[in-house]
Amino acid sequence: MTTPSSFSILLLLLLMPVVTNGEYSMQSEQEILNALLKNYDMRVRPPPANSSTEGAVNVRVNIMIRMLSKIDVVNMEYSIQLTFREQWIDPRLAYENLGFYNPPAFLTVPHVKKSLWIPDTFFPTEKAAHRHLIDMENMFLRIYPDGKILYSSRISLTSSCPMRLQLYPLDYQSCNFDLVSYAHTMNDIMYEWDPSTPVQLKPGVGSDLPNFILKNYTTNADCTSHTNTGSYGCLRMQLLFKRQFSYYLVQLYAPTTMIVIVSWVSFWIDLHSTAGRVALGVTTLLTMTTMQSAINAKLPPVSYVKVVDVWLGACQTFVFGALLEYAFVSYQDSVRQNDRSREKAARKAQRRREKLEMVDAEVYQPPCTCHTFEARETFRDKVRRYFTKPDYLPAKIDFYARFVVPLAFLAFNVIYWVSCLIMSANASTPESLV
């Protein structure tokens, strides 16, 4: 029969391992770290997983894009904030076979970062970068029982992005994000993307940029660096951006089209209204030149012709052509007016001579008491007069210009937009932008 005292002793013996395990697990991380770092040399890279002396360390990379804040066309750069993760195996840090009872699933030890070997990864296209340190440094480092290391850090970079602006503003831009070891060749470090999720996007990333939208990304491009010091393994992420066209439709194409249409009003103004037609032509031409300068100020100087240059050049040609058309019409009118003046003067001189020759041929005629009625021109007559081909050459030139110039501008638009859409569709893949 079990006595109360023996039952209490048995219960105490059953609870002792639980308490002991709790006290032991609180000390286990410190004991494991002390055991791992006792003979650890951070100056030596870890041996490969399948050999103790030779072979490269495989570094698996995963990137989470947290923010795309700016794409600067003038400086050809973009700003990105990301969580950069690297995984590799360091057999010297494996603690699953060290004899510890019930070891933790992993050790989170960011404070020992400076005591461990970490890949010397750098970003060749980076112009400026910084790590986030508020409230503490945004990074962590985990050690798993089999020696796998997970290193994660939040960084912000401004990276270069050489842009091809031939199709601006209907262009696609492919920006590369490269990472490579600075000192270790491919014999020492081999980079590879995480096969499950090489790149992650935070929800909403790429859709809130002012002028661009992130269309796609790829991670299969080869960027191995071959130099006189060796070959260095490299990983490349390509970001494909599409420029938002709606902004340029409202701010560029619509205003310039309206300026061209306004310049056509000159064809409908009387050819003798010199002040009005010249003022209209000069004003539209200066406005077109000002808009062209403002648009080019937002772009870097390049040595090739952009599709926006073709559009602006064509619009300026149509506006300038309207001014030249009036100059030609005015010149033709002045020539014909001079001819008429000479003919009129000749007729007056002829009549004067005929009067002097008439001596006795005068016949008395009583003064006329009749009245002359002038028919008023109706609105229909005015419209018919505008759309009826005149016989006077300067007026005939204006008449043809009212229809030929708009049709020419319409034909230019058809050719321009069809060509741009075809070229833009062909440039919508990263391979076409390499």
UniProtKB/Swiss-Prot annotation:
It comes from the Eukaryota. Pentamer. Homooligomer that can form functional heterooligomers with glc-1. It is a multi-pass membrane protein. It is found in: Postsynaptic cell membrane; Cell membrane. One of its GO terms (biological process) is chloride transmembrane transport. Residues 1-22 form the signal peptide. Keywords: Cell membrane, Chloride, Chloride channel, Disulfide bond, Glycoprotein, Ion channel, Ion transport, Ligand-gated ion channel, Membrane, Postsynaptic cell membrane, Receptor, Signal, Synapse, Transmembrane, Transmembrane helix, Transport. It comes from Caenorhabditis elegans. Glycans are attached at N50, N216, N426. The keyword Phosphoprotein does not apply. Glutamate-gated chloride channel subunit; channel properties depend on the subunit composition. Glutamate binding triggers a rapidly reversible current in heteromeric channels formed by glc-1 and glc-2, while the anti-helmintic drug ivermectin and other avermectins trigger a permanently open channel configuration. Channels containing only glc-2 are activated by glutamate, but not by ivermectin (in vitro). The heteromeric channel formed by glc-1 and glc-2 is also activated by ibotenate, and it is blocked by picrotoxin and flufenamic acid. Residues 23-246, 297-303, 423-434 are extracellular. Disulfide bonds join C161-C175, C223-C234. This is Glutamate-gated chloride channel subunit beta. Belongs to the ligand-gated ion channel (TC 1.A.9) family. Glutamate-gated chloride channel (TC 1.A.9.4) subfamily. GO terms for molecular function: extracellularly glutamate-gated chloride channel activity; transmembrane signaling receptor activity. The gene is glc-2. L-glutamate binds at R66, R85, S152, S181. The chain crosses the membrane at residues 247-269, 275-296, 304-324, 399-422. Its main location: membrane. One of its GO terms (cellular component) is chloride channel complex. Gene3D superfamilies: Neurotransmitter-gated ion-channel ligand-binding domain, Neurotransmitter-gated ion-channel transmembrane domain. Residues 270-274, 325-398 are cytoplasmic.
